[in-house]
Amino acid sequence: MSHRDEAQHNPPNLIFTYGTLKRGFANHGLLQSLFSTNDAAFLGTYRTAEELPLVCGPHGVPFLLNFPGSGLGRHRVRGELYAVSDHGLTRLDELEGISVGHYERLPIRLLPDGDSSIGGGGGGATVVEAEAYYAHRSFAEDMWRRNGWLGFEVYTEEACKYVRRALRPKNRSFLEDIRLFVSSSS
């Protein structure tokens, strides 16, 4: 079955991106290649319905943390929503290191960006159910602590100083980089 046939039989997967997969960022090329095979489509800019922490880890890699709530360090994170085929989802999962414990893909509730309402009451925006790549639970709490329990609303390369994979040290794994990062002081 071709990817186009697959898309006709399976509903698309809705994926919220908040970091390097966004337009203009280092890993957006993967989504562009998926656009060319009809395995992905841009749906618009959105923000999280719940306040969540978004932080930077080693090499300026962004991590959304699955710690919903309100208060200092949590924001309605802004990003982009994509419809992705099953083939496209497999490619994104590979990039995000799902099988090796870098991220985990979990449900997320979104609102269209620019809508000031929050889900319900008085003509509020329709909440969209999607999935996002969150920091793996094995290190998320340490990542939150290492960032001083402060997150940000939108990922920018200027704030995080992202380092492309090709320019990172080759003598250790990304999980080792994460362990070193969370065990160091700021």
Where are these regions (language model features)?
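Glycine-aromatic micro-motifs
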Residues: 2-186
